[in-house]
Structure formats: C-alpha cells, structure tokens
Amino acid sequence: MTASVTTSVTAHPTAPAPASQRPPADQDGADILTVARREVLDGGRGLDEAGVLAVLRLPDETLTDLLALAHEVRMRWCGPEVEVEGIVSLKTGGCPEDCHFCSQSGKFDSPVRSAWLDVPSLVDAARQTAATGATEFCIVAAVRGPDARLMAQVREGVAAIRAAVDINVACSLGMLTSEQVDELTAMGVHRYNHNLETARSHFPNVVTTHSWEERWETCEMVRAAGMELCCGAILGVGESLEQRAELATQLAALEPDEVPLNFLNPRPGTPFGDLPLVEPRDALRAIAAFRLAMPRTILRYSGGREITLGDLDVQGMLGGINAMIVGNYLTTLGRSAEADLKMLAELSMPIKSLQATL
C-alpha cells in the first residue's frame, strides 16, 4: 500500500481542475509516453504512481497519441477480444452503508426503495444476458455483507443459473467473512466483485461506515481462495489527480483479474448528487492511465460511461478498455446491448470470456 489514511474529511469535494488549469507534469508529454512505450508496451511492466500521475496531467494535444499507445498495450498484452457482462440486482436499496455516491444507501433521501428478486427472475435475467453473447453474469446485492438469508438465496440462484444457462456467474455481495468466501467458491462462483472505489487517502471523504482496509481484506481473501477478483473504481467523487494515480497503483498492487471503471453519475438525494461529471477528455486520460498501470488486466467499462462520454465511448475501446457491461446498471440506465454489440462488431473486437495474464 502506498499511502496512509488521511485524518481530515473534506465536507464538499471538488472535481480535478481541467487540463488547461493544471500544473505541468513532472515529465513532459513526450518523455512519459516514451517511458510508457519502453516499460509498458515493450516490457509489460505497469507505470508507477509518478508515471500514472504524469499521464493524468498530459495536455489535451497529446490525447490522441496517449490513447493510441494504451490501445497498443491492450492489444499486445490482452489481445483484441472483449469480455461482455450483464448484471442484475438481487437485493436493491436499503443498504446500511453511507457510500456518498450511491442511491441504494438507506441513509440518504433517494427515490430507490428496497426490493428483492426471486430465483426464477434471476435465471431469466441470466438467460437474457447470455442471449446477447455475454459470457459473464453478476448477481449484486446492496448490503454491507451477506447474512444467512442472502447467502441461501445466492446459493439457490447460482445453482439454478448454472443448471440452466451457459454463462459464468459472478457475485458482488459486499464484505465477506472467510467462511462466506469458501462457500461462494464451493458454489462455483467464477469471479467476485468488491471495489476499492477510491484511493486510500480519499476514502474517508467518500464512505464513513466502513474502512478502506476492510474492503482490501475481502479482496485478499477472495484471491487467496482461488476465485477471480474483480476490483475497481469510481472516478469523479472529489478525488484529486494525485489520488487517481494513487488508486491506480493501489489496484495494481492488489493484482485483480478485472478492474471495472465507473464514472460518477450524480444521484439525487445523495451527498454527491451535485458534483460535476468527469470531463470526457479527463475520463479518456484516466482510462489510458489505468491501462498503462495494469497492462495485463481486464479493464471494464462500467457505470456512468454513457453520461460521461456519450458517443466518445468508442475512443475508450480504442484507448485501453477490453470489457464492458451491457444493458442497464443497478439503478441507472445503460446503452442498449444492441448498440454496444454493433460497436464491437464495427471495431472487429470479438466477444470472449477473458482471464488476466498476471
């Protein structure tokens, strides 16, 4: 781990300054791109925190070259294939945690209300996901961690899906005990999602009901049990560029199989409901920077890409991304699966179940 937890909490976080207002990078654009080409493209070694920060500080005029390099890295170390995933909310709303970006928290005055999905509906959702060509289906629950009732529902749902649908089943159920990790592994859960969300130094500004270290501990248990680990980020929650670089290298140190990149889609009633969207060019720079930090990892487009990038999302596919969620998210709308599959076909990027080459 590369940074210590801060003791002060900022009441009103602000977005990073636009590129035109930022201090110059420690290295000029040509230098860091040369370093990245040698170390990452040729050597397969991710950039360190200083290198990632230099990339995030690059001016707009270098963006085309940066994205091209990140795409080269993705093609060399991951290949042209794209992993497609669908997600479904087994248990929506009423979460006791206070993640400031999330409308499913029971602590905020958001329009999301608690609801459960039954097992036949889970199987139907998995079947619809598989029909798109997707190879991954993730069952998500808005909880701190699963209780006995939820684990029983997941056990039944995973068994029913595996019996009826040819698709990998993943889960995202919050923080786990070692016994729950072992139980999910025994069920045949393919991959477990638990995001770090933001840099360790910024985490107290985003969540106060649990610690960054608790999240890290669950991730380490998942890896130790032999399940694939999906662990990512949400960008635009008031973090600085320095903290984005910190997060990228903390994720790299964890060595997840997959890193989903979310961009804040401000939700009414949440503490971050009035934060600005990440600027599209900054989002693309971040995608490239995370690819250059983790050249061999599955890097997935996740929530917020539509509202953040719009039609520029194709640039992310040509700038380091090699996986995506299709269809809707947990409480927000995504692009149609048909539109995303058409984009992949036009880019000649075949759909395939992926493994990180760590």
Swiss-Prot record:
Pfam families named among the record's database cross-references: BATS, Radical_SAM
Cofactor(s) recorded in Swiss-Prot or TrEMBL: [4Fe-4S] cluster; [2Fe-2S] cluster
Keyword Transit peptide recorded: no
Residues of the Radical SAM core domain: 80-305
Annotated binding of [2Fe-2S] cluster, by residue: 138, 171, 230, 300
Biological processes, Gene Ontology terms: biotin biosynthetic process
Positions of [4Fe-4S] cluster binding: 95, 99, 102
SUPFAM superfamilies hit by this protein: Radical SAM enzymes
The reaction(s) this protein catalyses: (4R,5S)-dethiobiotin + (sulfur carrier)-SH + 2 reduced [2Fe-2S]-[ferredoxin] + 2 S-adenosyl-L-methionine = (sulfur carrier)-H + biotin + 2 5'-deoxyadenosine + 2 L-methionine + 2 oxidized [2Fe-2S]-[ferredoxin]
Keyword field: 2Fe-2S, 4Fe-4S, Biotin biosynthesis, Iron, Iron-sulfur, Metal-binding, S-adenosyl-L-methionine, Transferase
Family membership: Belongs to the radical SAM superfamily. Biotin synthase family.
Subunit structure: Homodimer.
PANTHER family per record: BIOTIN SYNTHASE (PTHR22976), BIOTIN SYNTHASE, MITOCHONDRIAL (PTHR22976:SF2)
Protein name (record): Biotin synthase 1
Organism name: Frankia casuarinae (strain DSM 45818 / CECT 9043 / HFP020203 / CcI3)
